Amino acid sequence: MPVYQYKARDRQGRLVEATIEAEDLRTAARLLRDRGLFVAEIKEPGKGLQAEVRIPALERGPGLKDLAIFSRQLATMLGAGLTLLQALAILERQTENRKFREILKQVRTDVEGGMAFSEALSKHKIFSRLYVNLVRAGETSGGLDLILDRLASFLEKELELRGKIRSAMTYPVIVFVFAVGVAYFLLTGIVPQFAQILTDLGSELPLLTRFLIAVSDLLRAATLPLLLLAVALFFAYRWYYGTPQGRRVIDRLKLRLPVFGNLNRKTAVARFSRTLALLLSSGVNIVEALDITKGTAGNSVVEEIVEAAKLKIQQGDPLNLTLAQHPFVFPPMVSSMVAIGEETGALDTMLSKVADFYEREVDEAVASLTAAIEPLMIIFLGVIVGMIVAGMFLPLFKIIGTLSVQ
C-alpha cells in the first residue's frame, strides 16, 4: 500500500507533518479528515530522482530522548482527559523518528486489539523492564498519567546525567586525538626533512633527536600495521568486556580510576537511588524493585552488590546492612540515610534525597574535573609539540654555535 506525505493542521492550529498509508490520494485525504485534520498538502511518494533515499543501517533508532519526550507528552494528554488510544494516535502522527513511529503504530494496534498497554510495550526493546513494570503498576492503580509523569522526569534526569558525563569525557578525548594528529604530522612530515638536513651536515645528533628519528622511521614504515593493531586491540577489548570475567575486571577498574573513578561511583549511586526510589514510590515491592534496578546499574560491580542486597532482604535483613558492607561504592552517608528510611517507612523519600545529593555531587565533580583537565591537556599538547621541536632544533643550534666559534 502506498505511503503518502502530508502537511495538515489539527483543531488547535498546530502543523502536523507525517506520512499515511492509503490506497490512493482521495482515500488518504478522507482518512486525514476523519482524524480531525485540515489537509494543507498531500503528495505521492517521490519516484526516480525525487524518491527519498533511505539506508536502514544509517537510520537512527529511537533513543532515550525520544522515550522521555513520548512519556512526557503521553502523561500530559492522559492528564488532560484524552483516552490512551487517542493519545497514541496523536503521538504516532507527530513523532519524527520513523522507527519509533512504526513502534507506536504497532503498540496502538495491539491496544486496539484488546492487549494491555504494558504488554504491548513489552514487545519492543526500547521499553525497558523498568518502564514496562511501572506502566503495569500505573494500569493497576489507575494512575497511569502520574506514573508516566514520574517516568518522564526520571528519563529527563538520566539524560541530563549522561550529558554531564559525556561533556566531562569529550574534551580530553578531543585534545588527545588532536595531539596525536599533530605529533603524527610532525613525525612523518617534518622530522624526516630535518633528519635529511642533519645527516647531510654530518653532525653528531643528541639522544632526543635520534629517538625522534627512530620513531619517525617506524611510523612511516609501519603505519598500516599499527592501525591494524589498534583495530585488533579495540575488538579484543570489546570481546573481553563481553565475557563475565572481563566485564567484572574492567568495571572494577572504572570505579578505581584516579580521577574518573570518583565520578563513576557518584554516578552509580545517583542512578541506583533514583531508580529504586521511582519503583518503590510507584508501588513495586522492594525485591522486584531491586531486581529491576540491578539491570539499570550499568556496572557489574554495582549489579553484584544490588543482587546481594536482594538476597539478604529475602532472608529478612534490611537493605542498609548490605550497602554498609560496600563503603567504597556506597559511602556511610548512603547506608545511614537508607537505614533511617527503612525505620520510618519512607525509604523512597530518603532514596530521592540521596539521588538529589549525588546528582549535585556529579555536577560539582564534572565542573572541577573540566577546570582541572583543560590546563593539563594544554600542557600535554605543549610538551608533545615542544619535545619534537626541541629534538629537531637542538642539533641546528649546536651546528650554528660551532660555526660561529670557527
Curated annotation (Swiss-Prot):
Taxonomic placement: Bacteria, Thermotogati, Deinococcota, Deinococci, Thermales
GO biological process entries: protein secretion
Assembly notes: Homotetramer. Interacts with PilB.
Transmembrane segments: 69-91, 171-191, 211-231, 377-397
InterPro entries: GspF/PilC, T2SS_GspF/T4SS_PilC_CS, T2SS_GspF_dom, T2SS_GspF_sf
Gene3D superfamilies tied to this protein: Type II secretion system (T2SS), domain F
Top-level taxon of origin: Bacteria
Name of the protein in its database record: Type IV pilus assembly protein PilC
Cellular component terms per the entry's GO annotation: plasma membrane
Protein role: Essential inner membrane component of the type IV pilus (T4P) that plays a role in surface and host cell adhesion, colonization, biofilm maturation, virulence, and twitching, a form of surface-associated motility facilitated by cycles of extension, adhesion, and retraction of T4P fibers. Controls both pilus assembly and disassembly and plays an important role in PilB localization to the complex and ATPase activity.
UniProtKB keywords: Cell inner membrane, Cell membrane, Membrane, Transmembrane, Transmembrane helix, Transport
Family, as annotated: Belongs to the GSP F family.
Membrane topology: Multi-pass membrane protein
Organism of origin: Thermus thermophilus (strain ATCC 27634 / DSM 579 / HB8)
Subcellular location: Cell inner membrane
Keyword Transmembrane helix part of the UniProt annotation: yes
Claim: tRNA processing is one of the keywords in the record: no
Matches recorded under Pfam families: T2SSF (PF00482)
